[in-house]
Amino acid sequence: MAKQKHIDVWIDKLTNSIENTISGESFPTVISLVTYSELKSVTKTKGWNFNWKAELKKNDHQVYKLTTRDNPKIIHGLVSLKLEEDHVFVSIIENAPFNIGKTKLYKGVPANLFAYACKVSWDLGNQGSVAFVSKTRLIEH
């Protein structure tokens, strides 16, 4: 079995914003629990890679969406968190299809979602410890 790599990262600032790649303008963000009805347009046929409805049905996971403060109906990214005894496990994290690749519209979405996972861990008394196992097939970002 291959030795697992450990990455030690310190989140020094939670910016609560994403940046438009065209204008450079920064937009304040909100991270909140997603509802089943909000996932109506989050499907593989619309360019999403994971089955978020199935993830939301897992009783031991919490699924959060990242939106902008001024436009809460547009989901920029999603993250599924599982609260463990001594850390938070990031089960799945995904950018919206329009935020992927060289033509992405906004940057900073995954960083905001990971920082939020660290905050949840910190609030639970786990010193911000977060675990994540990358998928076997990485998706172009």
Give the location of each predicted region.
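Short, electropositive alpha-helical surface patch
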Residues: 139-141
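Non-catalytic substrate-recognition and accessory regions of acyl/acetyltransferase enzymes
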Residues: 1-104, 112, 116-131, 137
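An anionic, turn-rich surface loop/hairpin at beta-sheet edges
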Residues: 108
